[in-house]
């Protein structure tokens, strides 16, 4: 049996950031982090596009806006201190049609309200920044950047262990129950006990929450995001980061071009329903998980409302020319021959019972349990601040 003051479930970047921040502020209170895989950062974090988000898209005052802005500063400081390579390269958000201008204006207004360094640009300035882009106007965000979040996680893992706290891999949580003031977790490596539990289980955060006494009407619906690498000889088509104007009805940013910190250029992702919570390939099927998604009232309402968009995403997934067509709206010179299939990611998206996509970070808490229920993008950028806030919340429970 293992025991600690705090037990964290989930070894992605949010769980690791929380563990590190706790260890910094409470060096005398023990912590155990449990990860079901054989190493850290195997899922959302390890399949991240590596963008340091500025916070331009998010509703002012929202958890995403606040944590992204503060988290980005903390992430840059951490990278400098730990000698992790990152680059503030800038990005452009591009309107290709007149009907996108109102949404572009709203993004710019949000950026200003959130304190983001951004400017509206015309077609000629757009061409100066990205000579191969097609657009009628746009927004330049000089402070956006790129980093390898897996490297950040490796460094966090080392620092957590240096604090004297434990990271236990291959430790899947099977059941959770409470006895007096203790939380008892039954895992594949035996019993783990703690006074406080933080659920950072990402794609399975609702499942872990369901093992506790807390109940929720939301459910995680997995959306696969598929990527392509651009062949080296065509990387000149994008100098830094090129994004479209996203559909304001969805918390997805649309297929875009991303230069990577260690070289190379990738494009994507789309957002297609995955048939398994860890369904990184189109052929991946977990029948019970897929059936659970289909039976969920919230998903049924979501699918009924947005079936056309869903079918379009599915079409782009199966038919490469359709994916290429979406990219050509931004960079007309890109062709199907320029693209090489890259690893996909899966986004853990919380959906409510009424069919709404949860658009903000969601934290559910009781006296001794904190569940981070919805932490998709920009959670990697925001992770160090999320970890700091969770640590502060936990601290109020210690007498």
Spans of features found by a protein language model:
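Glycine-rich active-site loop/strand segments that organize a redox cofactor
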Residues: 41-71, 82-86, 273-309
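Flavin-dependent oxidoreductases
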Residues: 17, 176-286
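Helical element adjacent to the flavin cofactor pocket in flavoenzyme catalytic cores
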Residues: 139-196, 200, 204-207, 382-395
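Beta1/beta-strand and adjacent pyrophosphate-binding region of the FAD-binding site
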Residues: 1-14, 32
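Glycine-rich FAD pyrophosphate-binding loop
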Residues: 23-47
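Dinucleotide-binding Rossmann-like beta1-alpha1 core, especially the glycine-rich loop
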Residues: 50-125, 135, 254-255, 276
């Amino acid at each position: 049996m293992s025991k600690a003051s705090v037990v964290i479930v989930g070894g992605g970047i949010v769980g690791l950031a929380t563990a590190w921040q706790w260890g910094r502020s409470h060096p005398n209170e023990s912590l155990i982090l449990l990860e079901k895989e054989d190493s850290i950062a195997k899922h959302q974090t390890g399949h991240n596009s590596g963008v340091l988000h500025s916070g331009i898209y998010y509703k002012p005052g929202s958890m995403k806006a606040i944590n992204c802005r503060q988290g980005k500063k903390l992430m840059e400081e951490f990278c400098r201190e730990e000698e992790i390579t990152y680059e503030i390269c800038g990005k452009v958000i591009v309107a290709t049609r007149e009907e996108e201008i109102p949404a572009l204006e709203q993004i710019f207004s949000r950026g200003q309200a959130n304190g983001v360094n951004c400017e509206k640009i015309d077609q000629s300035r757009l061409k100066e920044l990205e000579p191969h882009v097609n657009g009628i106007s746009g927004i330049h965000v000089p402070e956006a950047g790129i980093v390898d979040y897996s490297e950040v996680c490796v460094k966090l893992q080392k620092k957590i262990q240096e604090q004297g706290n434990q990271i236990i891999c291959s430790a899947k949580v099977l059941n959770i129950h409470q006895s007096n003031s203790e939380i008892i977790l039954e895992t594949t490596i035996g019993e783990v006990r703690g006074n406080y539990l933080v659920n950072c289980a990402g794609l399975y955060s609702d499942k872990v929450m369901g093992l506790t006494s807390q109940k929720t009407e939301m459910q995680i619906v997995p959306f696969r995001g598929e990527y392509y690498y651009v062949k080296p000889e065509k990387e000149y088509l994008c100098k830094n980061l090129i994004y479209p104007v996203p559909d304001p009805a969805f918390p997805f940013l649309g297929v875009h071009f991303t230069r990577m910190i260690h070289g190379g250029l990738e494009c994507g992702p789309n957002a297609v329903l995955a048939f398994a919570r860890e369904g990184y390939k189109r052929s991946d099927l977990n029948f019970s998980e897929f059936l659970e998604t289909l039976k969920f009232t919230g998903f049924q309402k979501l699918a009924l409302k947005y079936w056309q968009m869903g079918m379009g995403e599915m079409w782009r997934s199966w038919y490469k020319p359709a994916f290429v067509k979406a990219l050509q709206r931004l960079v007309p010179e890109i062709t199907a021959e320029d693209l090489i299939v890259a690893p996909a990611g899966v986004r853990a998206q919380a959906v409510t019972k009424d069919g709404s996509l949860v658009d903000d970070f969601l934290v559910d808490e009781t006296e001794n349990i904190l569940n981070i229920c919805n932490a998709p993008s920009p959670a990697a950028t925001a992770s160090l601040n999320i970890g700091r806030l969770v640590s502060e919340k936990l601290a109020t429970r210690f007498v």
